[in-house]
């Protein structure tokens, strides 16, 4: 398992984490067996948005005696009414559901209290200015939440939330398909066939700005929908018309700026194993470029995907790293100190580029790498 620091929370989590909704139809014994397997393989981070009381109790039983082995991300505003899940902004219902979560998990706190599913700007304003944020802050002051997070599928809303300084963790949907789409407050557009009927080129700029802002400011992203609800794993369902592997989807998500972990939604032991395969996968197995390059309607032409195919550099420059740190400066009047320091620590810098062109011949996306190195050298001064 590769472990990463969860931004400014300081928490250390495995890059492959558990989204627990897939355990809903399992017995307590089956859930405990899956948790045994997860622990043996280094998984220490889980997300639980589901309000289903039986699922919560089964996960609590699986955690019994080993609560300390997990960083738990539990959701506020997810309640159980009339035998089904409901999203709410009612503070009393949200508090009662959160207290039910703690009781059923057998713990008195969660590391991350995730304000659940905020996709519309009006909803975000209600959350930030109303009783829900006050509730989250109160729970944090009481120690029942250690850090506040927010989940969203809309990059504009997510960016607005991140800029407030009120959240430390963002749960966001990341995969190469969604990254092409413009912002929307209707999550259903992410799955709609008509969204992909026209030509789409490069990562949507709102998403790129969100990822780079989070990287700069230490607001960490944990990822949902890395497989696009499973569609990206199927040639019949993928908008690309060709399947990706779980490892390729995970590699894509885990190489985006700001991302620390992926909450893999797994319904079987085989699916947990498929996600864990990322940890031991070869560079060839992680390589997602073959699934993305050469598509008729979809193009990432000229956009650095941080895939590393440009390597090896004749003088040893980490080209993907230089591009990432340069891109992090673009929206800033001054270079953030954290970005400047990360660039300084690179063993070789953009000014060392000899313009041999070897990297450009290797790049599957036609990036003007030599030009990017000149821009980075001018920006950073070396």
Q: Predicted segment positions?
A:
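N-terminal binding-site loop/beta-alpha segment at the start of enzyme catalytic domains
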Residues: 1-76, 135, 141
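Active-site groove signature of glycoside hydrolases
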Residues: 100-124
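Active-site mouth loops of central-metabolism enzymes
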Residues: 19-29, 76-95, 121, 125, ...
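Short, acidic/polar
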Residues: 26-38, 89-106, 152-160, 244-252
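Conserved, mostly hydrophobic/aromatic
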Residues: 6, 18, 38, 46, ...
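Beta/alpha (TIM)-barrel catalytic core signal, keyed to glycine-rich beta->alpha loops juxtaposed to Asp/Glu
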Residues: 118-321, 331-345, 371
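Short cysteine clusters
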Residues: 304-313, 353-359, 363
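Iron-sulfur (Fe-S) cluster-binding segments and ferredoxin-like electron-carrier domains
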Residues: 314-330, 361, 365-379
């Amino acid at each position: 398992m590769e472990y990463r620091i969860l931004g400014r929370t300081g928490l250390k989590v495995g890059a492959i984490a558990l989204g627990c909704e897939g355990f809903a139809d399992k017995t307590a014994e089956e859930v405990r067996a899956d948790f045994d397997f997860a622990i043996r393989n280094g998984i220490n981070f889980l997300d639980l948005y589901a309000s289903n009381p039986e699922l919560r109790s089964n996960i609590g039983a699986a955690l019994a005696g080993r609560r300390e082995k997990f960083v738990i991300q539990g959701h506020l505003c997810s309640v159980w009414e009339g035998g089904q899940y409901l999203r709410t902004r009612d503070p009393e219902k949200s508090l009662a559901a959160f207290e039910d979560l703690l009781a059923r998990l057998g713990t008195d706190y969660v590391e991350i209290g995730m304000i659940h599913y905020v996709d519309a700007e009006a909803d975000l304003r209600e959350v930030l200015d109303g009783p829900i944020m006050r509730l989250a802050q109160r729970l944090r002051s009481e120690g029942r939440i250690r850090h506040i997070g927010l989940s969203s599928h809309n990059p504009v809303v997510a960016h607005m939330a991140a800029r407030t300084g009120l959240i430390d963790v963002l749960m966001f949907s990341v995969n190469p398909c969604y990254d092409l789409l413009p912002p929307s407050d209707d999550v259903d557009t992410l799955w709609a066939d008509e969204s992909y009927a026209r030509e789409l080129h490069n990562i949507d700029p709102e998403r790129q700005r969100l990822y780079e802002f989070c990287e700069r400011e230490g607001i960490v992203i944990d990822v949902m929908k890395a497989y696009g609800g499973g569609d990206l794993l199927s040639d019949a369902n993928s908008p690309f018309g060709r399947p990706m592997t779980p490892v390729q989807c995970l590699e894509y998500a885990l190489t985006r700026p700001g991302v620390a972990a992926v909450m893999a939604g797994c319904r079987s032991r085989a699916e947990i194993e498929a996600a864990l395969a990322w940890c031991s996968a070869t560079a060839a197995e992680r390589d997602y470029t073959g699934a993305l390059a050469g598509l008729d309607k979809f193009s990432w032409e000229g956009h650095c995907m941080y895939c590393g195919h440009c390597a090896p550099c004749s003088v040893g420059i980490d080209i993907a790293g230089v591009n990432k740190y340069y891109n992090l400066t673009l929206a800033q009047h001054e270079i953030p100190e954290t970005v400047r320091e990360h660039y300084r620590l690179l063993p070789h810098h953009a000014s060392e580029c000899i313009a041999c062109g070897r990297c450009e011949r290797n790049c599957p996306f036609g990036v003007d790498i030599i030009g990017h190195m000149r821009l980075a050298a001018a920006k950073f001064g070396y």
